[in-house]
């Protein structure tokens, strides 16, 4: 009889709420794959704490956005980087997993690699090296052994850019398809009158400020073109007051709903959507809701477009490799253009049918081949990296990289 596997100690460092959500699912999947003989150290939030992590400090200490807030708290953040890396080095874990928040987690990884050069380091969630500062991919070779990608085209990008081995483990939204997709009754509501149109102007106050007027004007024009429809606006408690204030000037104020369950319920009934660029466009696409994406930034941020190397800012378009979803940016994010793009999606013409077919292709590209969850694939990749380091070679206990169709992004 072979000896049972020895206990593992894994360091996990997440820098914000989204990383905390990925982290707790990874911890759970590692225990399911390995059993209870596994201990965790590092930094996380409430979800990871519920799975047994005693965070070195509150995740709120490092979850800072924006240039000015970061500069104000820079000395404290640098201190947390040092504290985190020193604690990991002292603990001598079997592996380090860093999750998103590269400005923090990658600095921790570099310090740990210098002190423990043989420690396997896994980066869960790729930085957007395919869009911004591509030289980061090659630089990561010095301190990352494996990248776990959420988007199916990212392994190809790392191969092209000369970065670490990158594998597609699946996007966490794949685990939520039952919540996103309609049951038979909801599917019938999608096809009934009046149609449900969902509008999502963003989750930040700056987005609300820049988009609400244009979205409201577009919806007024849409009503003139197609007649009555039911308008639903999902939002979050921290921006509810701003959203309600801005929507009060619309000709017909929307039905405003709060929280994720209500948002997904609206998606399941929606005929079409108008949404700010972001993860929500991928949620809508996986829910099978034809949409128009839009965004506006300030003058300073607009200049950064010359440094960004992607043909689209919408995740579904990048995954598909084609401009299947209309996007209206900056000056194009105007009521007339938004209404003109949205109206055909509420009807049943060729524009809607083409996008519905594209969303089906997106679903096929993102699907994992064996039915296991993204968290299970991520756990297998982490364990494979540890086993491979011990054996002096890579062990392929994860999903093999898959390439998207070879085609340029077409406008249309």
Protein language model annotation of sequence segments:
Residues 1-412:
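Nucleotide-activated sugar donor-binding and catalytic core shared by glycosyltransferases
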């Amino acid at each position: 009889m072979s000896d049972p596997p020895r206990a593992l100690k894994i360091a996990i460092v997440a820098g914000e709420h989204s990383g905390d959500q990925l982290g707790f699912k990874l911890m759970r999947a590692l225990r399911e794959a390995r059993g209870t003989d596994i201990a965790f150290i590092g930094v996380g939030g409430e979800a990871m704490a519920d799975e047994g992590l005693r965070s070195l400090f509150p995740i709120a200490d490092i979850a800072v956005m924006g240039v000015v807030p970061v500069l104000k708290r820079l000395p404290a953040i640098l201190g947390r980087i040092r504290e985190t890396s020193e604690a990991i080095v002292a603990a001598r874990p079997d592996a380090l997993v860093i999750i998103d928040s590269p400005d923090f987690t990658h600095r921790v990884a570099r310090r740990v690699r210098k002190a423990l050069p043989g420690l396997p380091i896994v980066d869960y969630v790729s930085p957007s090296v395919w869009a911004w500062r591509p030289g980061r991919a090659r630089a990561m070779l010095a301190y990352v052994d494996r990248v776990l990608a959420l988007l199916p085209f990212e392994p190809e990008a790392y191969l092209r850019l000369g970065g670490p081995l990158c594998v597609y483990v699946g996007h966490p939204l794949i685990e939520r398809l039952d919540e996103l997709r309609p049951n038979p009754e909801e599917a019938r509501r999608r096809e009934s009158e009046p149609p449900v149109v969902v509008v999502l102007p963003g989750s930040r106050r700056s987005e609300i400020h820049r988009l609400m007027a244009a979205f409201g004007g577009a919806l007024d024009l849409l009503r003139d073109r197609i007649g009555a429809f039911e308008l639903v606006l999902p939002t979050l408690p921290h921006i509810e007051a701003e959203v309600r204030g801005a929507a009060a000037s619309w000709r017909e104020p929307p039905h405003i709903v709060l929280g994720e369950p209500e948002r997904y319920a609206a998606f399941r009934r929606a005929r079409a959507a108008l949404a700010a660029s972001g993860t929500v466009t991928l949620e809508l696409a996986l829910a099978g809701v034809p949409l128009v994406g839009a965004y506006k930034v300030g003058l300073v941020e607009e200049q950064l477009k010359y440094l960004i190397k992607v043909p689209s800012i919408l995740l579904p378009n990048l995954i598909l490799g084609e401009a299947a979803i209309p996007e209206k940016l900056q000056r194009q994010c105007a009521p007339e253009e938004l209404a003109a793009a949205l109206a055909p999606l509420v009807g049943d013409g060729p524009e809607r049918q083409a996008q519905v077919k594209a969303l089906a292709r997106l679903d096929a590209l993102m699907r994992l081949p064996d039915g296991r969850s993204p968290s299970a694939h991520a756990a297998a990749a982490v364990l494979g990296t540890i086993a491979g380091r011990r054996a002096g070679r890579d062990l392929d206990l994860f999903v093999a990289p898959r390439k998207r169709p070879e085609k340029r992004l077409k406008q249309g």
